Amino acid sequence: EAIAQGRQRILLTLATGTGKTCIAFQAAWKLFHSRWSLHAQTHPAAAKKRPRILFLADRNVLANQAFNDFGPFGEDAIVRIEPGEVKKLGAVPKNASVFFTIFQTFMSGPEDEHGNKTPYFGQYPEDFFDFIIIDECHRGGANDESSWRDILDYFAPAVQLGLTATPKRTVNADTYSYFGEPVYSYALKEGINDGFLTPFKVLPIVGTLDEYV
């Protein structure tokens, strides 16, 4: 609904283990099969073309997990962007519909003749991606002082969906300032009450380790 209403930045807050990747998959799947794209919104004839979707994470384990979960799209539609493969090919991959990478890979890149780093994300046109999913977006991607923010600003034309398990706090206020208030939230307590998460108890343990350090 948020995409249909023209929202450019969207935030979902769900407790860990309650299906953030599944929701990201379903959103991408629907856009992919409906042939939705930013260009098609103003040029209906362009609706014949599949959208280009980027999944950004801050750790390889998350990017790899998402890449495997998105397998139903078909091996010709998805691609994992890795620095070794980019160096081998001499360029970033562009012949796919759903791209997976981590911020660190996109921020890396060769130096130009003046010794300035040219990040790999700059090899894509600014309007290359229609939809960007930012997993664990509270980890710094929306921070004004973060170099990761350069990626989000560069691909500003795309609809950006931030996923986080962290409720609003002082330390992640930048995330909420950038994306706005969540369009949907599902708290840890709700996940436990609904049977999706295991109840837990916090047991304080008093140790003597500090006496020996």
Question: How would you name each of these model-derived features?
Answer:
Residues 1-213:
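RecA-like P-loop NTPase motor core of helicase/translocase proteins
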